[in-house]
Amino acid sequence: NRYPLFLFATYMMYLISACLAGKPVRYDAKAYHYEAIQKLMRHQQVILACPEMLGGLACPRQPAEIIGGTAQDVLTGHAKVMTQQGEDVTQAFIIGAYKTLELAQQHQIKTAVLKENSPSCGRNFIYDGRFSATKRAGTGVTAALLLQHGFEVCSEEEFLARLTGL
């Protein structure tokens, strides 16, 4: 045999919302700290992304919600993402979603772990578009785009339950 034998350890790489990894990138500049995610980071199994910041929004920033439809409607131009003050931030959300998709593709990610309830990252729930703190079933813009392209998307709760076997 002329070819050397190489053994490769294969690790699952995850795309994770940066705010879940302790980065203060949420709209209110807060972050979450999950030890399980920190452990994955120490093992270099994580690509971090904040779609809203990738789309050019500042931190802190005004809260935003999907108005007039679903995340899929936002992606097709039939709904908007607006701040509570009435600023249209739809394009920033779309740009951030596509930049996040590009990262996932470049790094051959299979699973994205995104922040539930976010207008970008929500997997199962988002806020209802009336700034009333009421949640409704739905996905955020980035989550919808990743799902559309065949990526597994889960919320932090689903992911942490999977890691701990609950």
Located regions from the model:
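Short hydrophobic targeting helices and cationic amphipathic motifs
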Residues: R2-L7
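Extreme N-terminal starter segment of soluble prokaryotic enzymes
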Residues: Y11-L15
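Active-site loop/lid in soluble adenylation, ligation, and acyl-transfer enzymes
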Residues: S17-K30
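Divalent-metal-activated hydrolytic enzyme cores
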Residues: P24-Y27, E35, L54, Q72-K99, ...
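Short, surface-exposed acidic-centric catalytic microdomains
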Residues: Y32-M82
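Short acidic/polar active-site loop segments enriched in Thr and Asp
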Residues: K110
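Short, well-ordered beta-to-alpha junction loops that form the rim of enzyme active sites
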Residues: K115-S118
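Short Gly/Thr/Asp-enriched flexible loops that form oxyanion-binding sites at enzyme active sites
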Residues: C121-V141
